[in-house]
Amino acid sequence: MQLPSFLEVYKGLISTDSISSTDPSWDHGNEKVIEKMAQWFKDVGFSVEVVEVEPGKHNMVAKMGSGEGGLLLAGHSDTVPFDEGRWNFDPHALTEHNNRFYGLGTADMKGFFAFVYEAAKKMDWSKQTKPLYVLATCDEETTMLGARHFTENAPFKPDYCIIGEPTSLVPIRGHKGHVANAVRVTGKSGHSSDPALGVNAIEIMHEVLFALMQLRDKLVKEYHHPGFAIPSPTLNLGHIHGGDSANRICGCCELHYDVRPLPGISLDGLDNMLRSALKEVEAKWPGRIEITPLHEPIPGYECQHDHPFIGGMESVCETESQTVNYCTEAPFLQELCPTLVLGPGSIDQAHQPDEFLSFDFIDPTIDVLSKSIRKYCF
Protein backbone atom coordinates (compact mmCIF):
# COMPACT_ATOMS: atom_id res chain seq x y z
CA MET A 1 0.00 0.00 0.00
CA GLN A 2 1.31 3.44 -0.95
CA LEU A 3 1.32 5.63 2.15
CA PRO A 4 0.39 9.31 1.88
CA SER A 5 3.29 11.74 1.74
CA PHE A 6 4.06 14.34 4.39
CA LEU A 7 2.59 17.02 2.14
CA GLU A 8 -0.60 15.04 1.48
CA VAL A 9 -1.16 14.56 5.21
CA TYR A 10 -0.43 18.22 5.92
CA LYS A 11 -2.91 19.29 3.22
CA GLY A 12 -5.51 16.89 4.58
CA LEU A 13 -5.21 18.32 8.08
CA ILE A 14 -5.48 21.96 7.03
CA SER A 15 -8.33 21.39 4.56
CA THR A 16 -10.51 19.71 7.19
CA ASP A 17 -12.42 22.23 9.30
CA SER A 18 -11.98 21.66 13.04
CA ILE A 19 -12.82 25.07 14.51
CA SER A 20 -13.82 25.17 18.18
CA SER A 21 -15.45 28.19 19.75
CA THR A 22 -17.62 29.25 22.66
CA ASP A 23 -19.86 30.80 19.98
CA PRO A 24 -22.12 27.93 18.80
CA SER A 25 -22.26 29.34 15.27
CA TRP A 26 -18.47 28.84 14.98
CA ASP A 27 -18.17 25.57 16.92
CA HIS A 28 -17.75 22.95 14.19
CA GLY A 29 -16.38 19.92 16.02
CA ASN A 30 -13.32 17.84 15.12
CA GLU A 31 -14.79 14.47 14.14
CA LYS A 32 -13.73 14.61 10.48
CA VAL A 33 -10.11 15.54 11.13
CA ILE A 34 -9.83 12.87 13.83
CA GLU A 35 -11.19 10.27 11.39
CA LYS A 36 -8.48 11.20 8.90
CA MET A 37 -5.73 11.11 11.52
CA ALA A 38 -6.90 7.76 12.83
CA GLN A 39 -6.68 6.21 9.35
CA TRP A 40 -3.25 7.68 8.62
CA PHE A 41 -1.77 6.34 11.85
CA LYS A 42 -3.42 2.95 11.36
CA ASP A 43 -1.82 2.77 7.91
CA VAL A 44 1.62 3.33 9.49
CA GLY A 45 1.06 0.46 11.94
CA PHE A 46 -0.38 2.11 15.05
CA SER A 47 -3.31 0.73 16.99
CA VAL A 48 -5.84 3.56 17.29
CA GLU A 49 -8.66 4.40 19.66
CA VAL A 50 -11.07 7.30 19.10
CA VAL A 51 -13.05 8.49 22.12
CA GLU A 52 -16.11 10.71 21.86
CA VAL A 53 -15.72 13.17 24.73
CA GLU A 54 -18.91 15.07 23.90
CA PRO A 55 -21.16 14.96 20.83
CA GLY A 56 -18.99 16.00 17.88
CA LYS A 57 -15.88 16.27 20.08
CA HIS A 58 -13.29 13.50 19.92
CA ASN A 59 -9.86 12.51 21.20
CA MET A 60 -7.60 10.12 19.34
CA VAL A 61 -4.95 7.93 20.95
CA ALA A 62 -2.59 5.99 18.67
CA LYS A 63 -0.08 3.46 20.01
CA MET A 64 2.98 1.84 18.47
CA GLY A 65 4.65 -0.93 20.45
CA SER A 66 3.95 -2.45 23.84
CA GLY A 67 5.14 -2.39 27.42
CA GLU A 68 5.22 0.26 30.10
CA GLY A 69 6.31 3.88 29.98
CA GLY A 70 7.45 5.28 26.67
CA LEU A 71 6.85 8.64 25.03
CA LEU A 72 3.62 10.56 24.42
CA LEU A 73 3.51 13.06 21.53
CA ALA A 74 0.45 15.23 22.08
CA GLY A 75 -1.41 18.18 20.68
CA HIS A 76 -4.81 19.59 19.87
CA SER A 77 -6.72 19.02 16.66
CA ASP A 78 -8.95 22.11 16.86
CA THR A 79 -8.28 25.65 15.66
CA VAL A 80 -9.63 29.07 16.48
CA PRO A 81 -12.19 30.79 14.20
CA PHE A 82 -10.92 33.20 11.55
CA ASP A 83 -11.78 36.61 10.13
CA GLU A 84 -12.11 35.91 6.42
CA GLY A 85 -11.76 39.58 5.52
CA ARG A 86 -8.25 39.70 6.98
CA TRP A 87 -6.88 36.59 5.23
CA ASN A 88 -5.10 36.79 1.88
CA PHE A 89 -5.11 32.99 1.57
CA ASP A 90 -7.81 30.36 1.97
CA PRO A 91 -7.71 29.38 5.69
CA HIS A 92 -8.91 25.86 4.84
CA ALA A 93 -6.34 25.13 2.13
CA LEU A 94 -2.61 24.57 2.48
CA THR A 95 -1.01 27.24 0.30
CA GLU A 96 2.72 27.18 -0.49
CA HIS A 97 4.09 30.68 -1.02
CA ASN A 98 7.51 32.28 -0.43
CA ASN A 99 8.86 29.18 1.36
CA ARG A 100 5.94 29.12 3.76
CA PHE A 101 2.88 26.95 4.34
CA TYR A 102 -0.17 29.18 4.85
CA GLY A 103 -3.42 27.95 6.40
CA LEU A 104 -5.44 27.77 9.61
CA GLY A 105 -3.67 25.30 11.92
CA THR A 106 -0.34 25.22 10.08
CA ALA A 107 1.47 26.43 13.21
CA ASP A 108 -1.21 26.25 15.91
CA MET A 109 -1.15 23.34 15.75
CA LYS A 110 -2.81 20.44 14.00
CA GLY A 111 -0.12 20.58 11.32
CA PHE A 112 2.19 19.09 13.97
CA PHE A 113 0.59 15.69 13.41
CA ALA A 114 1.92 15.61 9.85
CA PHE A 115 5.44 15.81 11.30
CA VAL A 116 4.70 13.03 13.80
CA TYR A 117 3.26 10.90 10.99
CA GLU A 118 6.33 11.45 8.82
CA ALA A 119 8.78 10.64 11.63
CA ALA A 120 6.85 7.46 12.47
CA LYS A 121 6.62 6.42 8.80
CA LYS A 122 10.41 6.64 8.40
CA MET A 123 11.24 4.87 11.68
CA ASP A 124 12.63 1.33 11.81
CA TRP A 125 10.56 -0.14 14.65
CA SER A 126 12.34 -3.50 14.82
CA LYS A 127 14.33 -2.61 17.95
CA GLN A 128 11.63 -0.68 19.81
CA THR A 129 11.59 -1.37 23.56
CA LYS A 130 8.94 1.07 24.84
CA PRO A 131 5.67 2.32 23.35
CA LEU A 132 5.11 5.53 21.43
CA TYR A 133 1.74 7.20 21.90
CA VAL A 134 0.14 9.96 19.85
CA LEU A 135 -2.67 11.99 21.41
CA ALA A 136 -4.88 14.40 19.46
CA THR A 137 -7.33 16.30 21.66
CA CYS A 138 -10.44 18.41 21.15
CA ASP A 139 -11.33 21.90 22.36
CA GLU A 140 -7.94 23.16 23.51
CA GLU A 141 -8.84 26.58 22.13
CA THR A 142 -11.92 26.83 24.36
CA THR A 143 -12.22 24.66 27.48
CA MET A 144 -9.25 22.25 27.33
CA LEU A 145 -11.97 19.59 27.41
CA GLY A 146 -9.97 16.97 25.54
CA ALA A 147 -6.86 17.20 27.71
CA ARG A 148 -8.91 17.27 30.91
CA HIS A 149 -10.87 14.19 29.85
CA PHE A 150 -7.78 12.28 28.76
CA THR A 151 -5.89 13.00 31.98
CA GLU A 152 -8.84 11.90 34.12
CA ASN A 153 -9.30 8.66 32.16
CA ALA A 154 -5.80 7.85 30.88
CA PRO A 155 -5.41 4.07 30.42
CA PHE A 156 -1.60 4.28 30.47
CA LYS A 157 1.21 6.25 32.06
CA PRO A 158 4.03 7.29 29.73
CA ASP A 159 7.47 8.18 30.98
CA TYR A 160 7.51 11.52 29.19
CA CYS A 161 5.29 13.80 27.12
CA ILE A 162 6.00 16.37 24.40
CA ILE A 163 3.24 18.77 23.36
CA GLY A 164 3.83 20.05 19.83
CA GLU A 165 2.68 23.66 20.19
CA PRO A 166 4.69 26.20 18.14
CA THR A 167 7.82 26.99 20.16
CA SER A 168 10.31 27.42 17.27
CA LEU A 169 11.71 24.03 18.38
CA VAL A 170 12.79 25.45 21.75
CA PRO A 171 11.85 23.21 24.72
CA ILE A 172 9.42 25.00 27.04
CA ARG A 173 9.59 23.79 30.64
CA GLY A 174 7.00 26.07 32.25
CA HIS A 175 4.26 28.60 31.70
CA LYS A 176 1.79 30.65 33.67
CA GLY A 177 -1.86 29.71 34.08
CA HIS A 178 -4.95 31.67 33.16
CA VAL A 179 -8.01 32.63 35.18
CA ALA A 180 -10.66 34.97 33.77
CA ASN A 181 -13.69 36.25 35.68
CA ALA A 182 -16.62 38.58 35.16
CA VAL A 183 -17.70 40.92 37.97
CA ARG A 184 -21.25 42.15 37.51
CA VAL A 185 -22.53 45.00 39.66
CA THR A 186 -26.28 45.50 39.77
CA GLY A 187 -27.37 48.93 40.92
CA LYS A 188 -30.70 50.72 40.55
CA SER A 189 -31.33 52.97 37.58
CA GLY A 190 -33.04 56.33 37.85
CA HIS A 191 -33.02 59.89 36.55
CA SER A 192 -29.65 61.57 36.99
CA SER A 193 -31.26 64.74 38.34
CA ASP A 194 -31.72 63.02 41.72
CA PRO A 195 -28.93 60.55 42.65
CA ALA A 196 -30.90 59.49 45.72
CA LEU A 197 -33.43 57.79 43.46
CA GLY A 198 -30.99 55.07 42.44
CA VAL A 199 -27.80 53.14 43.15
CA ASN A 200 -25.00 53.85 40.68
CA ALA A 201 -23.37 50.60 39.57
CA ILE A 202 -20.38 52.44 38.10
CA GLU A 203 -19.59 53.97 41.49
CA ILE A 204 -19.69 50.54 43.12
CA MET A 205 -17.50 49.20 40.34
CA HIS A 206 -14.99 51.94 41.19
CA GLU A 207 -14.62 50.30 44.61
CA VAL A 208 -14.27 46.87 42.97
CA LEU A 209 -11.52 48.19 40.68
CA PHE A 210 -9.64 49.73 43.59
CA ALA A 211 -9.76 46.42 45.51
CA LEU A 212 -8.51 44.44 42.51
CA MET A 213 -5.67 46.90 41.89
CA GLN A 214 -4.62 46.51 45.52
CA LEU A 215 -4.59 42.74 45.02
CA ARG A 216 -2.52 43.19 41.86
CA ASP A 217 0.12 45.05 43.88
CA LYS A 218 0.03 42.35 46.55
CA LEU A 219 0.59 39.59 43.98
CA VAL A 220 3.65 41.40 42.62
CA LYS A 221 5.12 41.82 46.11
CA GLU A 222 4.43 38.32 47.44
CA TYR A 223 5.05 36.03 44.45
CA HIS A 224 8.20 35.83 42.35
CA HIS A 225 9.64 33.27 39.94
CA PRO A 226 13.06 34.17 38.49
CA GLY A 227 12.57 31.77 35.58
CA PHE A 228 10.00 34.03 33.92
CA ALA A 229 10.66 37.22 31.97
CA ILE A 230 7.71 38.73 33.87
CA PRO A 231 8.50 37.12 37.23
CA SER A 232 5.22 37.81 39.07
CA PRO A 233 1.57 36.96 38.46
CA THR A 234 -0.26 39.53 36.36
CA LEU A 235 -3.79 40.86 36.82
CA ASN A 236 -5.30 42.70 33.86
CA LEU A 237 -8.50 44.74 33.76
CA GLY A 238 -9.49 43.88 30.22
CA HIS A 239 -13.06 44.98 29.52
CA ILE A 240 -15.68 47.13 31.21
CA HIS A 241 -19.15 48.29 30.24
CA GLY A 242 -21.85 50.05 32.19
CA GLY A 243 -24.83 52.30 31.74
CA ASP A 244 -26.79 53.39 28.71
CA SER A 245 -27.12 57.17 28.87
CA ALA A 246 -25.44 60.22 30.39
CA ASN A 247 -28.68 61.30 32.06
CA ARG A 248 -29.48 57.99 33.77
CA ILE A 249 -28.09 56.51 36.95
CA CYS A 250 -26.18 53.41 35.86
CA GLY A 251 -28.15 50.29 36.77
CA CYS A 252 -25.58 47.70 35.72
CA CYS A 253 -21.83 47.55 35.15
CA GLU A 254 -19.71 44.55 34.18
CA LEU A 255 -15.94 44.06 34.31
CA HIS A 256 -13.89 41.27 32.74
CA TYR A 257 -10.41 40.68 34.15
CA ASP A 258 -7.80 37.97 33.99
CA VAL A 259 -5.00 36.68 36.20
CA ARG A 260 -1.98 34.71 35.00
CA PRO A 261 -0.75 32.78 38.05
CA LEU A 262 2.75 31.39 38.41
CA PRO A 263 3.35 27.64 38.70
CA GLY A 264 2.81 26.62 42.29
CA ILE A 265 -0.10 28.97 42.96
CA SER A 266 -3.13 26.73 43.41
CA LEU A 267 -6.35 27.63 41.64
CA ASP A 268 -8.31 27.29 44.88
CA GLY A 269 -5.84 29.55 46.67
CA LEU A 270 -6.04 32.15 43.92
CA ASP A 271 -9.84 32.03 43.93
CA ASN A 272 -9.80 32.61 47.69
CA MET A 273 -7.50 35.62 47.22
CA LEU A 274 -9.75 37.10 44.54
CA ARG A 275 -12.90 36.67 46.59
CA SER A 276 -11.22 37.92 49.75
CA ALA A 277 -10.13 41.07 47.92
CA LEU A 278 -13.77 41.93 47.22
CA LYS A 279 -15.16 40.82 50.57
CA GLU A 280 -15.43 44.33 52.07
CA VAL A 281 -17.08 45.76 48.96
CA GLU A 282 -19.57 42.88 48.88
CA ALA A 283 -20.37 43.42 52.56
CA LYS A 284 -20.97 47.11 51.91
CA TRP A 285 -23.23 46.36 48.94
CA PRO A 286 -24.94 43.03 49.77
CA GLY A 287 -26.53 41.22 46.85
CA ARG A 288 -25.23 43.67 44.26
CA ILE A 289 -21.94 42.00 43.23
CA GLU A 290 -21.79 38.73 41.29
CA ILE A 291 -18.55 36.99 40.28
CA THR A 292 -18.60 34.31 37.56
CA PRO A 293 -15.78 32.54 35.69
CA LEU A 294 -15.45 33.26 31.97
CA HIS A 295 -13.91 29.83 31.36
CA GLU A 296 -12.56 26.86 33.27
CA PRO A 297 -9.39 28.04 35.05
CA ILE A 298 -6.00 26.76 33.87
CA PRO A 299 -3.22 26.32 36.44
CA GLY A 300 0.39 27.27 35.91
CA TYR A 301 2.74 24.51 34.83
CA GLU A 302 6.39 23.67 35.37
CA CYS A 303 8.45 20.58 34.67
CA GLN A 304 10.75 20.05 37.65
CA HIS A 305 13.76 22.22 36.80
CA ASP A 306 16.38 19.54 37.46
CA HIS A 307 14.49 16.66 35.82
CA PRO A 308 16.70 14.71 33.38
CA PHE A 309 13.98 14.97 30.71
CA ILE A 310 14.76 18.69 30.37
CA GLY A 311 18.47 18.07 29.89
CA GLY A 312 17.76 15.23 27.50
CA MET A 313 15.57 17.36 25.23
CA GLU A 314 17.93 20.33 25.45
CA SER A 315 20.57 17.97 24.10
CA VAL A 316 18.29 16.75 21.30
CA CYS A 317 17.34 20.31 20.31
CA GLU A 318 20.80 21.75 20.97
CA THR A 319 19.31 24.71 22.81
CA GLU A 320 18.36 25.64 26.37
CA SER A 321 14.80 25.33 27.62
CA GLN A 322 12.70 28.41 28.40
CA THR A 323 9.48 29.53 30.08
CA VAL A 324 6.60 31.42 28.45
CA ASN A 325 3.51 33.39 29.44
CA TYR A 326 0.90 31.74 27.19
CA CYS A 327 -1.07 28.61 28.13
CA THR A 328 -1.14 25.06 26.79
CA GLU A 329 -2.50 21.65 27.82
CA ALA A 330 0.73 20.97 29.75
CA PRO A 331 -0.72 21.49 33.27
CA PHE A 332 -3.07 18.57 32.67
CA LEU A 333 -0.69 16.16 30.93
CA GLN A 334 1.98 16.99 33.52
CA GLU A 335 -0.27 15.18 36.01
CA LEU A 336 0.61 11.96 34.18
CA CYS A 337 4.32 12.42 33.54
CA PRO A 338 7.10 15.00 33.04
CA THR A 339 5.97 17.20 30.16
CA LEU A 340 7.64 19.69 27.83
CA VAL A 341 6.14 21.90 25.13
CA LEU A 342 8.09 21.69 21.88
CA GLY A 343 7.04 22.09 18.29
CA PRO A 344 7.58 23.75 14.91
CA GLY A 345 6.55 27.28 14.01
CA SER A 346 6.36 30.51 15.96
CA ILE A 347 3.79 31.33 18.62
CA ASP A 348 3.62 34.75 16.95
CA GLN A 349 1.57 33.09 14.21
CA ALA A 350 -1.05 31.66 16.57
CA HIS A 351 -4.54 33.14 16.12
CA GLN A 352 -3.31 35.50 13.39
CA PRO A 353 -4.59 36.13 9.83
CA ASP A 354 -2.45 34.38 7.21
CA GLU A 355 -1.08 31.95 9.80
CA PHE A 356 1.97 30.20 8.38
CA LEU A 357 4.82 27.81 9.05
CA SER A 358 8.19 28.34 7.41
CA PHE A 359 9.67 25.58 5.26
CA ASP A 360 12.80 25.98 7.42
CA PHE A 361 11.08 23.95 10.16
CA ILE A 362 10.32 20.85 8.07
CA ASP A 363 13.55 18.85 8.22
CA PRO A 364 14.64 20.00 11.72
CA THR A 365 11.25 19.07 13.20
CA ILE A 366 11.24 15.59 11.70
CA ASP A 367 14.82 15.18 12.93
CA VAL A 368 13.98 16.29 16.49
CA LEU A 369 10.95 13.99 16.63
CA SER A 370 12.92 11.05 15.24
CA LYS A 371 15.72 11.56 17.77
CA SER A 372 13.19 11.89 20.62
CA ILE A 373 11.42 8.67 19.63
CA ARG A 374 14.71 6.78 19.41
CA LYS A 375 15.89 8.22 22.73
CA TYR A 376 12.79 7.32 24.75
CA CYS A 377 11.28 4.33 22.91
CA PHE A 378 14.39 2.35 21.86
UniProtKB/Swiss-Prot annotation:
How is the co-factor bound, per the entry? Binds 2 Zn(2+) or Co(2+) ions per subunit.
Major localization listed first in the record, in broad terms: cytoplasm
Binding of Zn(2+) 1 occurs at 76, 108, 165
**Keyword set, alphabetical order:** Amino-acid biosynthesis, Arginine biosynthesis, Cobalt, Cytoplasm, Hydrolase, Metal-binding, Zinc
Q: Give the binding site residues for Zn(2+) 2.
A: 108, 141, 351
Look up the EC number in the record and give it.
3.5.1.16
PROSITE patterns named in the record: ARGE_DAPE_CPG2_1, ARGE_DAPE_CPG2_2
Cofactor(s) of this protein: Zn(2+); Co(2+); glutathione
Annotated compartments: Cytoplasm
Q: Which Pfam families match?
A: M20_dimer (PF07687), Peptidase_M20 (PF01546)
Active site at which residues?
A: 78, 140
This protein's pathway reads: Amino-acid biosynthesis; L-arginine biosynthesis; L-ornithine from N(2)-acetyl-L-ornithine (linear): step 1/1
Which reaction is catalysed here?
N(2)-acetyl-L-ornithine + H2O = L-ornithine + acetate
**Protein's GO biological process:** L-arginine biosynthetic process
May I have one GO cellular component term?
Answer: cytoplasm
* SUPFAM superfamilies for this protein: Bacterial exopeptidase dimerisation domain, Zn-dependent exopeptidases
Kindly state the subunit structure of this protein. Answer: Homodimer.
Family (UniProt): Belongs to the peptidase M20A family. ArgE subfamily.
NCBIfam families assigned: AcOrn-deacetyl (TIGR01892), PRK05111.1 (NF003474)
State the function annotated in the UniProt record: Catalyzes the hydrolysis of the amide bond of N(2)-acetylated L-amino acids. Cleaves the acetyl group from N-acetyl-L-ornithine to form L-ornithine, an intermediate in L-arginine biosynthesis pathway, and a branchpoint in the synthesis of polyamines.
For this entry, the protein name equals: Acetylornithine deacetylase
